[in-house]
């Protein structure tokens, strides 16, 4: 056909050649309606997708949800959503912090990516949905199809428990499983990539036609001049301050660190976390290699690349956090009857892993294995995340951390945490550290600056609240601020004492309560202060206060939540069930937020 009789350009002809008969029929109707000046119905262009899927009856509506603590689950869910959009699927993408849990019963397809926090709990943003599904008012999900990917850490006993719980409960409530749940360890990329591919294929199989391009819109965006720093591409910052902020007699070593961000373009908000890529202690590496009788220059293969074992242990492999998988793998190579018996008992193995660093396994059960065998037993080294303790409104192009240095002894041998020890002991003044910002939209100050806030933290859990008050003061926020803080001793462990006193003088810390657990015979904790201040706390809640909790997930955060439920039930004259619902409503309204670890 010549161009004189065909008004379509060659590019359009090529595009049309790819369409199947059903899509051509639909496109014909669309074009006819346009020619008649009528509403053509479905919009075939999508700024965020390369295609729109057309079915004989109605398009698939897929909702991709994520429950993320550090951002990994969010990233995987974004990848899945983009893949589905590229295949023409109608996708709604939401993090659970912005999702109304009660609408779950209206969904057609739900694809959930969730991490796990604490002792197997759902991440903060996933709690409302978790509680709804496991509560008395759980919906009937007979019309739902679902798939779940869990992200976790095999070094913890409740590996991917949140994903397992969601997956099980969906099915119990009548939903149909689109495909089997997948569980991914810290090095989750390969598992996540396969799960995404399997999900895409399963969703495509559910559609009436194969995914194909109907129309595409390519929107050009201006290139960003600033480098996009991330976990995979960290910024190399200078450590400009390393100051111990606990007293000499304290049982704890807590450091205040400041990093220079000048010229980096790196941005963060109060409530975010900072990722730190640390290196393992060279002395620890030498101890390990000596025990295994391995030369530091012996070559090993990691992801298809060759490097010496010392370099691999320095910056590529996890050498401090023990796991059941490591001990089991080492037992097979060591051929030690006592160790073999130990790994045959799940409880004994879990207790041993919890109490024994990797290097001390080598002390307990000496064996001669190759450098490659040892490297194959270890997980990739991962960055450590710390709550940021500064506001850029106050400190400019700096970022501050408050870090408790992990120091302990095992069988008389001194051990140190990988990142805290790296920062405290091995990075010199103006030394370089690879860092990145991990946004935490689940821990944000209220947009309405007149709202009061209640900050509850213990130990280094005070870090984000220093950032919060710096931010509130910089913005001249009118809302009242109440700090409830706990630590061991007033004299040695009152972190940032002078700064809190200054906030009081400046009129930005209106109420404060402190729990010093070891300053009297009977231990007092922050949850005790919550109960003691029950009436005032309830009054603040009635005034619209936002409640923030930062600290240990396994004990402190649970005890604080139980205390809050007691206060709500007593002061609000509510049943335990109604108190639970009240607190869950606060959570959904972003008035109860936790940063726990």
Swiss-Prot record:
InterPro entries annotated for this entry?
A: CysJ, CysJ-like_FAD-binding, CysJ_Proteobact, FAD-bd_FR_type, Flavdoxin-like, Flavodoxin/NO_synth, Flavoprot_Pyr_Nucl_cyt_Rdtase, Flavoprotein-like_sf
As to how many cofactors bind and how, the note says: Binds 1 FAD per subunit.
What is the protein name for this chain? Sulfite reductase [NADPH] flavoprotein alpha-component
Q: Where does NADP(+) bind?
A: 517-518, 523-527, 559
| Keywords from the UniProt entry | Amino-acid biosynthesis, Cysteine biosynthesis, Electron transport, FAD, Flavoprotein, FMN, NADP, Oxidoreductase, Transport
Q: How does it assemble?
A: Alpha(8)-beta(8). The alpha component is a flavoprotein, the beta component is a hemoprotein.
Tell me its family.
Belongs to the NADPH-dependent sulphite reductase flavoprotein subunit CysJ family. In the N-terminal section; belongs to the flavodoxin family.
């Amino acid at each position: 056909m010549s161009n004189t009789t065909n008004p379509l350009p060659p590019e359009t002809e090529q595009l049309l050649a790819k369409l199947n008969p059903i899509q051509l029929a639909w496109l014909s109707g669309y074009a006819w309606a346009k020619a008649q000046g009528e509403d053509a119905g479905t919009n075939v262009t999508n700024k965020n997708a390369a295609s729109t899927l057309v079915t004989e009856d109605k398009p698939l509506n897929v909702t991709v949800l994520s429950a993320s603590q550090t951002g990994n689950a969010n990233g995987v869910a974004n990848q899945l959503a983009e893949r589905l959009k590229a295949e023409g699927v109608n996708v709604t993408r939401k993090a659970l912090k912005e999702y109304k849990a009660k609408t779950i019963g209206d969904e057609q397809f739900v694809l959930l990516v969730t991490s796990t926090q604490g002792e197997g709990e759902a991440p903060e943003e996933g709690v409302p949905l978790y509680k709804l599904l496991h509560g008395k008012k759980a919906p009937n999900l007979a019309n739902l199809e679902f798939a779940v990917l869990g992200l976790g850490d095999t070094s913890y006993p409740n590996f991917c428990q949140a994903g397992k719980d969601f997956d099980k409960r969906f099915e119990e409530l009548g939903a149909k499983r689109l495909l089997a749940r997948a569980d991914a360890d810290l090095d989750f990329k390969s598992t996540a990539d396969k799960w995404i591919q399997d999900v895409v294929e399963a969703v495509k199989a559910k559609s009436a036609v194969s995914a194909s391009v109907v129309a595409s819109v390519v929107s050009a965006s201006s290139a960003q001049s600033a480098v996009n720093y991330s976990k995979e591409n960290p910024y190399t910052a200078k450590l400009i301050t390393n100051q111990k902020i606990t007293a000499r007699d304290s049982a704890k070593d807590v450091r205040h660190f400041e990093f220079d961000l000048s010229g980096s373009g790196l941005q963060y908000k109060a409530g975010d976390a900072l990722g730190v890529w640390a290196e393992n202690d060279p002395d620890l590496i030498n101890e390990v290699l000596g025990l295994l009788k391995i030369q530091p220059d012996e070559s090993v293969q990691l992801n298809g690349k060759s490097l010496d074992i010392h370099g691999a242990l320095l910056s590529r492999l996890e050498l401090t956090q023990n796991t059941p998988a490591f001990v089991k793998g080492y037992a097979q190579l060591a051929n030690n009857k006592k160790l073999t018996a130990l790994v045959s008992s799940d409880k004994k193995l879990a207790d041993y892993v919890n109490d024994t660093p990797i290097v001390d396994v080598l002390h307990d059960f000496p064996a001669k294995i190759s450098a490659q065998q040892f490297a194959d037993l270890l997980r990739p080294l991962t960055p450590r995340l710390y709550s940021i303790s500064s506001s850029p409104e106050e400190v400019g192009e700096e970022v501050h951390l408050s870090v408790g240095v992990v120091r302990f002894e095992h069988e008389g041998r001194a051990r140190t945490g990988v990142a805290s020890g790296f920062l405290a002991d091995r990075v010199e003044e103006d030394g370089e550290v690879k860092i990145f910002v991990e946004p935490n939209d689940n821990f944000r100050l209220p947009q309405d600056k007149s709202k009061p806030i209640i900050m509850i933290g213990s130990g280094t859990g005070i870090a984000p609240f220093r950032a919060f008050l710096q931010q509130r003061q910089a913005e001249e926020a009118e809302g009242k601020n109440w700090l409830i803080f706990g630590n061991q001793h007033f004299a040695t462990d009152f972190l940032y004492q002078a700064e809190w006193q200054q906030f009081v003088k400046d009129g930005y810390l209106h109420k404060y309560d402190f729990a010093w657990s070891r300053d009297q015979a009977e231990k007092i904790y922050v949850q005790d202060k919550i109960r003691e201040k029950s009436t005032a706390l309830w009054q603040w809640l009635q005034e619209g206060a936002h409640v923030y909790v930062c600290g240990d997930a396994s004990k402190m955060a649970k005890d604080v939540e139980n205390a809050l439920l007691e206060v709500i039930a007593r002061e609000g004259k509510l049943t335990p069930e109604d108190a639970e619902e009240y607190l869950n409503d606060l959570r959904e309204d972003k008035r109860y937020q936790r940063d726990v670890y």
